[in-house]
């Protein structure tokens, strides 16, 4: 059977379910597909079809993730759901599933639990910009005052991690009832209300082509009679012949002008996000730049050496370290196209970090790298990946 063409007639948004184990993330995902299937916006997927998500490898890390797609009247969604807590941690830190927004599922019967807190913290650290809350299992609560209490607790927790707790939509309902075909306010009605809140509250993300231009340099050539060419894949934005760019990272920042853009040996008017291009640079010699630097719009990104990060350390089974590391650990940090050595500083109350841990650290690199919040990186020892991380904050 021929593959259906992906219709781009609606804006596309990436979302996912987050929250404590057994609070109903996967049941909610199944319920959304069931309810939207009625209007032709989804194919119904039962709980066990979502729960047995296949394992994937992202930057050397094994992650189980279920990918579900559906659409509302206004939008097309790609939705990720992870079976296990460790999968969420890895997924969010590696950026394997970039989320434009998340649905936080909280059981009304239990209230916020340790993983509720951890997922909200991770969402804050890795830059998930918006959260909508589904207060699940409300059929198990008779007392409306208790429900209000849980709601207040959730709002306070969100505020603690700098989300706008007072204005975030909280939709009460029961994913199980919706799956059983209950058409009341807490069943199907709640799912429709949730999707309306997601449609309205989570903005359509800015497309990569609309952001300021950035291209990591993979290679540098000199072409006789033409000059110096930097090759790489455009990460975001667009670049036209005649535009001025900065070369950022590793060495002092330099400015230059793009005098040509080539792709597959053909000249282009402009290169855009996703294109593998060669950019001809005015007035530069082959030795003036190197792999690991980036070409970028003036002033759009700066070089830094000190940052805070959230990292996941690979377990021994994933091919990571067999032993813990301590403060002063000096691995290589792989950003975009290059490794830079850096020293790790651990939080005050942490003596050592075990393989399989998820931890907030501070890093100081020996050379500056073009960096911004939410930039993912790998931690390597002698070319072998031992961890993955994301920049949570820039210090210097």
From Swiss-Prot:
E.C. code: 3.6.5.3
One Pfam family recorded for the sequence: GTP_EFTU_D2
Signal peptide positions (record): none
Cross-referenced CDD domains: EF_Tu (cd01884), EFTU_II (cd03697), EFTU_III (cd03707)
InterPro entries: EF-Tu_GTP-bd, EF-Tu_GTPase, EFTu-like_2, EFTU_2, G_TR_CS, P-loop_NTPase, Small_GTP-bd, T_Tr_GTP-bd_dom
Catalytic activity: GTP + H2O = GDP + phosphate + H(+)
Single GO MF descriptor: GTPase activity
Residues holding GTP: 19-26, 81-85, 136-139
Quaternary structure (record): Monomer.
Name of protein: Elongation factor Tu
Organism: Stigmatella aurantiaca
């Amino acid at each position: 059977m021929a593959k259906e063409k992906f219709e781009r007639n609606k804006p596309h948004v990436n979302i996912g379910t987050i929250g404590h184990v057994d609070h109903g993330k996967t049941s909610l995902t199944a319920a959304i597909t069931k309810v939207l299937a009625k209007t032709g916006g989804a194919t119904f997927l039962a709980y066990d079809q979502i729960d047995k998500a296949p394992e994937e490898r992202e930057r050397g890390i094994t992650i189980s993730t279920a990918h579900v797609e559906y659409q509302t009247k206004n939008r097309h969604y790609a939705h990720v759901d992870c079976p296990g807590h460790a999968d969420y941690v890895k997924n969010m830190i590696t950026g394997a599933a970039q989320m434009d927004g998340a649905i936080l599922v909280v059981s009304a019967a239990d209230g916020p639990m340790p993983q509720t807190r951890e997922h909200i913290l991770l969402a804050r650290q890795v830059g998930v910009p918006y959260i909508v809350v589904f207060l699940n299992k409300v059929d198990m609560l008779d007392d409306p005052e208790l429900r209000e209490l849980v709601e207040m607790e959730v709002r306070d927790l969100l505020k603690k991690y700098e989300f706008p707790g007072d204005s975030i939509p909280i939709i009460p309902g029961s994913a199980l009832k919706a799956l059983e075909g209950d058409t009341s306010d807490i069943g199907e009605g709640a799912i429709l209300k949730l999707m309306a809140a997601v449609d309205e509250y989570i903005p359509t993300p800015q497309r990569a082509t609309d952001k300021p231009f950035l291209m990591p340099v993979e290679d540098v050539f000199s072409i006789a009679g033409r000059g110096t060419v930097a090759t790489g894949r455009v990460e975001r934005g667009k670049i036209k012949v005649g535009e001025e760019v900065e070369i950022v990272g590793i060495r002092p920042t330099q400015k230059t002008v793009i005098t040509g853009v080539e792709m597959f040996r053909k000249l282009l008017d402009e290169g855009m996000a996703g294109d593998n291009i060669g950019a001809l640079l005015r007035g530069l010699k082959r030795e003036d730049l190197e792999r690991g630097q980036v070409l970028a719009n003036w002033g759009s990104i700066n070089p830094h050496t000190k940052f805070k990060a959230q990292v996941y350390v690979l377990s021994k089974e994933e091919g990571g370290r067999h032993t813990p590391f301590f403060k002063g650990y000096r691995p290589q940090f792989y950003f975009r196209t290059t490794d830079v050595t850096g020293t790790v500083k651990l939080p005050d109350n942490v003596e050592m970090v075990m393989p399989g841990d998820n931890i907030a650290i501070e890093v100081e690199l020996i050379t500056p790298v073009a960096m911004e919040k939410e930039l993912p990186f790998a931690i390597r020892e002698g070319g072998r990946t031992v961890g993955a991380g994301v920049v949570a904050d820039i210090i210097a």
